[in-house]
């Protein structure tokens, strides 16, 4: 009987009739997280969190473990898929005003921070050259914190440099954080269904709703099939497309790579960090590039929820999207002109979007009164 009730709830869950494909990314993210937990579990069975054996254990997984190459590639490329989906999911939230459902938005932003931390810890685990140096650069930012910085860095490293204790605790954190993500995802979904999802028009959906099943289940399944097909195509034909060539060499603390950079999904934040010549200023800008999302629900001034009928805001949104891509691109380049100038201008425009959002809303309200 309880199972029937659950199915009834799922089947009769009322959803707005007009939600578009942009609303499918939530279910895709859920699938990504399930895939990551499963593949990660099998990888953890064969991985060794030791600086002398970590790199060799990855090679052992790929070469000797049955379907180990598939697990490793699904896990690595699955992380990229996860971030593609989450960035689209956030962009949809910004465009259609989903952030006005404050509890859902704040829990979602917390999820993003947890996901970024998990991905960072995971990037260090293969103990390749780029893994080691990316970890060194990013964890070193803690030293910019006045008074506490050096103590916190030593505490995080488990010593006076990145070494075996660092790798062990990063593996422990990479293993435990996904369980926190799953718990918070459940809360995120519960909070969403407390108020119900918005729709492209930004109007009240209560007047026109349909059952979730079969309409939206099939709609979700189509996008999931497309995502899994794309994932398997990349895994089969281009498994190293997102990898850094330096990471195919074992970590060597005595040799610094020519250009240190994290995974592609962190490049926008890394580009903002690099654009500021001051260490503390850069660390603050890096933190703010993500934390600024927390302020969005509290700075909405427009009488319209969605950007669908706000042409000025649409222009600003797509400029913001282009800015995001430009910062990502400049972060892959060396720290030299013209890339430094471009990244500084792009970083400024990135934050200007969040500042001009309430100003534009206020101006639109004035125009509508005329």
UniProtKB/Swiss-Prot annotation:
GO terms classed as biological process: mitochondrial electron transport, ubiquinol to cytochrome c
UniProt cross-references to InterPro entries, sorted A to Z: Cyt_b/b6_C, Cyt_b/b6_C_sf, Cyt_b/b6_N, Cytb/b6-like_sf, Cytochrome_b, Cytochrome_b_C_euk/bac, Cytochrome_b_N_euk/bac, Di-haem_cyt_TM
Membrane topology qualifier: Multi-pass membrane protein
GO cellular component: mitochondrial inner membrane; respiratory chain complex III
Positions with a binding annotation for heme b b566: 89, 188
Keyword Iron found: yes
Cofactor note: Binds 2 heme b groups non-covalently.
Origin: domain of life: Eukaryota
Record localization: Mitochondrion inner membrane
Protein function: Component of the ubiquinol-cytochrome c reductase complex (complex III or cytochrome b-c1 complex) that is part of the mitochondrial respiratory chain. The b-c1 complex mediates electron transfer from ubiquinol to cytochrome c. Contributes to the generation of a proton gradient across the mitochondrial membrane that is then used for ATP synthesis.
Membership in a protein family: Belongs to the cytochrome b family.
Annotated protein name in UniProt: Cytochrome b
Source species: Chilabothrus angulifer
């Amino acid at each position: 009987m309880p199972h029937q009730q659950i199915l009834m709830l799922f089947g009769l869950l009322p959803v707005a009739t007009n939600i578009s494909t942009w609303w499918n990314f939530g279910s895709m993210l859920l699938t990504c997280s399930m895939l990551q937990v499963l593949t990660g579990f099998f990888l953890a069975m064969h991985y060794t969190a030791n600086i002398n054996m970590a790199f060799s254990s990855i090679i052992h997984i790929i070469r000797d473990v049955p379907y180990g190459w598939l697990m490793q590639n699904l896990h690595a490329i699955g992380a990229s898929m996860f971030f593609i989906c989450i960035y689209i999911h956030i962009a949809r939230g910004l465009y259609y005003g989903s952030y006005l459902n404050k509890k859902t938005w704040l829990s979602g932003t917390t999820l993003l921070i947890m996901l970024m931390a998990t991905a960072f810890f995971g990037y260090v685990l293969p103990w390749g050259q780029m893994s080691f140096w990316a970890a060194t650069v990013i964890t070193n930012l803690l030293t910019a914190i006045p008074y506490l910085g050096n103590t916190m860095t030593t505490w995080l490293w488990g010593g006076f440099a990145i070494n075996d204790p660092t790798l062990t605790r990063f593996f422990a954190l990479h293993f435990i954080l996904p369980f926190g993500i799953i718990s918070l995802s459940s809360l995120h979904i519960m909070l969403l269904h407390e108020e119900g999802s918005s729709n492209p028009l930004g109007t009240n959906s209560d007047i026109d709703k349909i059952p979730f099943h079969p309409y939206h289940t099939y709609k979700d399944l189509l996008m999931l099939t497309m995502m899994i097909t794309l994932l398997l195509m990349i895994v089969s034909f281009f498994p190293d497309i997102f990898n850094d060539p330096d990471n195919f060499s074992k970590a060597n603390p005595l040799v610094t790579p020519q250009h240190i950079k994290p995974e592609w999904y962190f490049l926008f934040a890394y580009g903002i960090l690099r654009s500021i010549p001051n260490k503390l200023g850069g660390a603050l800008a890096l933190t703010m590039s993500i934390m600024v999302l927390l302020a969005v629900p509290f700075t909405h001034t427009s009488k319209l929820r969605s950007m669908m009928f706000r042409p000025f805001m649409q222009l600003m949104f797509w400029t913001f999207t282009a800015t995001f891509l430009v910062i990502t691109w400049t972060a892959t380049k060396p720290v030299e002109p013209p890339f430094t100038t471009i990244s500084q201008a792009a970083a400024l425009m990135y934050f200007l979007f969040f500042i001009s959002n309430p100003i534009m809303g206020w101006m639109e309200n004035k125009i509508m009164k005329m």
